[in-house]
Amino acid sequence: MHATSHEPAVWHGTTILTVRKGGRVVIGGDGQVSIGQTVIKSNARKVRKLGKGDVIGGFAGATADAFTLFERLESKLEQYPGQLTRAAVELAKDWRTDRYLRRLEAMMIVADKEVSLVLTGTGDVLEPEAGVMAIGSGGNYALAAARALIDTDKDAESIVRRSLDIAADICVYTNRNITIEALAAE
């Protein structure tokens, strides 16, 4: 008799990277969505503008969960206009304490002209060191590449693109269908 697995299929994927350099902040992400060993979609858009366009964000994890969190963050940004850190902390509090939100499986990187933040389901709100942060299955590869490139003459967008290409070379859950959003930074 063969053993069968009744475990739910595991969604894999994505690499999201942010780089803050030279008066710009850039968030980029790949477009691959996989379930198990199968690519379901190659051109998903996991990076977008939020609020009134003064915040950009990217997500890794379950798509429906991420959109729920983006909506919640936009609501917090309406409550605390121009205060991304405060809005993110308030979202993180809700995420940790709300029974429904606690079940959501996603991570987010968000940025405005002043700050870049990573938000996790455990209530962490982290600001990256040296203006570089990555999440997702290829995040460590993209992060290493971006840190290696940050002190070169490349601009923020070039660093994000090259680093995501490197991650796609290594991580089977990351592809080269890259979406970029950028803002002027202080």
Swiss-Prot record:
Q: What is its main location?
A: cytoplasm
Report which reactions are catalysed by this protein: ATP-dependent cleavage of peptide bonds with broad specificity
Which UniProt keywords are present, listed alphabetically?
Answer: Allosteric enzyme, Cytoplasm, Hydrolase, Metal-binding, Protease, Sodium, Threonine protease
EC numbers, comma separated: 3.4.25.2
Q: Which InterPro entries match?
A: ATP-dep_Prtase_HsIV_su, Ntn_hydrolases_N, Proteasome_sua/b, Proteasome_suB-type
Identify the Pfam families for this entry. Answer: Proteasome
Give the superkingdom in one word. Bacteria
In alphabetical order, the GO MF annotations are: metal ion binding; threonine-type endopeptidase activity
The UniProt entry annotates the active site at T14
Q: Where in the cell is it found?
A: Cytoplasm
Residue positions annotated to bind Na(+) are A168, C171, T174
Q: Name one GO cellular component term.
A: HslUV protease complex
Provide the transmembrane region boundaries.
none
Indicate the family of this protein: Belongs to the peptidase T1B family. HslV subfamily.
Record's protein name: ATP-dependent protease subunit HslV
Q: Which gene encodes it?
A: hslV
